[in-house]
């Protein structure tokens, strides 16, 4: 299928349009199964799922994408097509659309989305081109602006939130649940806070050990989780588990062990859940002494960050627009080349056929005469195609692919278009 902006569409939900409950409801738990279903409907499909967005990226039209998502029982999603979809993708890679403006993690997340699509054989060449261009734009924005200068990630924003609630984290005991990329970001943000102790829990104990050694913490087995919750002032949970790992009943028991000897009330526990889907079972925030925060609560951190980087975000948006214009011109130029190549391939076949007919009618002749006739046929074909080629290129480069293809069909009576479709 031809590379053309109109064949690019994006749909989904993000922190702009949905709260944590809606994000969780929209997620696709079985990514391979989703991609397999999408493969039957589109020339290419990718799935981008992070803690604050779920987006489906396809080579196809917006109407088909809407119908497909509705068939998957999804609703309330945004839907973009063509230029606006590409602008969204580039802005996303640039960090402009992120909850934490300028954060760098989205670059890796886009690369992972493409890698997962390639593994599932759903990443078409066109989608690969678009994602790689978006990554290029994201890197360029960070190189030419200060949008990520002093930027915080979602993980470090969670640490800032906890710090704002307690006033300081110095001397505190902190438990990090999860040792993946987000867990590493959280741990790195905590490393400079002069903690008394940092604990790291993970389903795979070996990974907890590796992260704990990196940041001078203590690795914790998951069967000891609630004991260390009892010891901690703050718990930040960021696993990739498909189900809650901190349960309401067990947490309630742990909070009883935190009670002050005289007052009988538990010591307050700051519990920050930045996982998607959520790590903390619903209702845990109602337990006496528990102050539960989720992705939704990180918006206030983003507002503070954005106010100091608004000028850089504007510069980044200008960079995105310039790169978008360049990319679309390249796509249109490629589209023009495809149309012109189809026309010239058809014309060459006609030239050779008619030349051979003429030579056959003329009968025996010397090599020089045959060469003159061949040269004549080439010159005539070139002259006939000159104006047509210019018109086709003008239409395609202006984005009017339909008009360019109509010209090719009119000149070739459909033969070139048919042969080109068979090779795409």
From Swiss-Prot:
Catalytic reaction list: (S)-4-amino-5-oxopentanoate + tRNA(Glu) + NADP(+) = L-glutamyl-tRNA(Glu) + NADPH + H(+)
Gene that produces this protein: hemA
Known partners and oligomeric status: Homodimer.
PANTHER family to which the protein is assigned, alphabetical: GLUTAMYL-TRNA REDUCTASE
Family per record: Belongs to the glutamyl-tRNA reductase family.
The protein's name in its UniProt record: Glutamyl-tRNA reductase
Function comment: Catalyzes the NADPH-dependent reduction of glutamyl-tRNA(Glu) to glutamate 1-semialdehyde (GSA).
InterPro entries per record: 4pyrrol_synth_GluRdtase, 4pyrrol_synth_GluRdtase_dimer, 4pyrrol_synth_GluRdtase_N, GluRdtase_CS, GluRdtase_dimer_dom_sf, GluRdtase_N_sf, NAD(P)-bd_dom_sf, Shikm_DH/Glu-tRNA_Rdtase
Biological source species: Methanoregula boonei (strain DSM 21154 / JCM 14090 / 6A8)
Binding residues for substrate: 50-53, 98, 103-105, 109
CDD domains (alphabetical): NAD_bind_Glutamyl_tRNA_reduct (cd05213)
A single GO BP: protoporphyrinogen IX biosynthetic process from glutamate
Pathway per the UniProt entry: Porphyrin-containing compound metabolism; protoporphyrin-IX biosynthesis; 5-aminolevulinate from L-glutamyl-tRNA(Glu): step 1/2
Extra remark: During catalysis, the active site Cys acts as a nucleophile attacking the alpha-carbonyl group of tRNA-bound glutamate with the formation of a thioester intermediate between enzyme and glutamate, and the concomitant release of tRNA(Glu). The thioester intermediate is finally reduced by direct hydride transfer from NADPH, to form the product GSA.
E.C. code: 1.2.1.70
Site (described: Important for activity): 88
EC top class, as a word: oxidoreductase
Annotated binding of NADP(+), by residue: 178-183
A GO term for molecular function: NADP binding
Domain topic, free-text comment: Possesses an unusual extended V-shaped dimeric structure with each monomer consisting of three distinct domains arranged along a curved 'spinal' alpha-helix. The N-terminal catalytic domain specifically recognizes the glutamate moiety of the substrate. The second domain is the NADPH-binding domain, and the third C-terminal domain is responsible for dimerization.
Keywords on record: NADP, Oxidoreductase, Porphyrin biosynthesis
Domain of life: Archaea
Active site feature: 51 (nucleophile)
């Amino acid at each position: 299928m031809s590379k053309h902006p109109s064949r690019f569409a994006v749909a989904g939900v993000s922190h702009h349009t949905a709260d944590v409950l809606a994000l969780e409801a929209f997620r696709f738990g079985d990514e391979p199964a989703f991609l397999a279903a999408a493969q039957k409907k589109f020339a290419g499909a990718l799935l981008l799922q992070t803690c604050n967005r779920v987006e489906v990226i396809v080579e196809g039209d917006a109407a088909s994408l809407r119908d497909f998502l509705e068939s998957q029982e999804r609703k309330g999603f945004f839907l973009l097509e063509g230029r606006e979809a590409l602008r969204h993708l580039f802005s996303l890679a640039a960090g402009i659309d992120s909850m934490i403006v300028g954060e760098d993690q989205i670059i890796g997340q886009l690369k992972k989305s493409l890698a997962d699509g390639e593994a599932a054989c759903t990443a078409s060449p066109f989608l690969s081109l678009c994602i790689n261009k978006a990554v290029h734009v994201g890197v360029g924005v960070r190189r030419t602006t200060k949008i990520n200068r002093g930027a915080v990630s979602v993980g470090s924003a969670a640490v800032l939130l906890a710090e704002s609630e307690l006033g300081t984290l110095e001397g505190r005991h902190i438990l990090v649940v999860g040792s993946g990329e987000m867990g590493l970001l959280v741990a790195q943000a905590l490393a400079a806070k002069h903690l008394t102790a940092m604990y790291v829990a993970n389903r795979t104990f070996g990974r907890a050990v590796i992260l704990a050694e990196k940041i001078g913490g203590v690795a914790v087995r998951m069967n000891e989780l609630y004991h260390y919750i009892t010891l901690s002032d703050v718990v930040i949970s960021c696993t990739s588990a498909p189900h809650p790992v901190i349960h309401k009943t067990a947490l309630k028991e742990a909070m009883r062990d935190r009670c002050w000897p005289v007052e009988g009330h538990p010591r307050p526990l700051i519990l920050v859940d930045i996982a998607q889907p959520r790590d903390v079972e619903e209702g845990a925030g109602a337990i006496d002494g528990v102050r539960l925060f989720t992705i939704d609560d990180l918006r206030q951190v983003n507002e503070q960050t954005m106010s100091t980087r608004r000028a850089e975000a504007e510069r980044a948006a200008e960079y995105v627009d310039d790169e978008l214009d360049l990319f679309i011109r390249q796509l249109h130029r490629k589209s023009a080349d495809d149309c012109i190549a189809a026309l010239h391939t058809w014309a060459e076949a006609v030239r050779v056929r008619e030349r051979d007919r003429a030579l056959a009618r003329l009968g025996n002749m010397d090599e020089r005469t045959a060469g003159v006739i061949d040269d004549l046929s080439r010159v005539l074909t070139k002259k006939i195609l000159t104006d047509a080629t210019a018109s086709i290129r003008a239409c395609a480069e202006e984005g009017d692919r339909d008009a360019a293809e109509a010209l090719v069909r009119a000149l070739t009576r459909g033969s070139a278009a048919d042969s080109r479709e068979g090779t795409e």
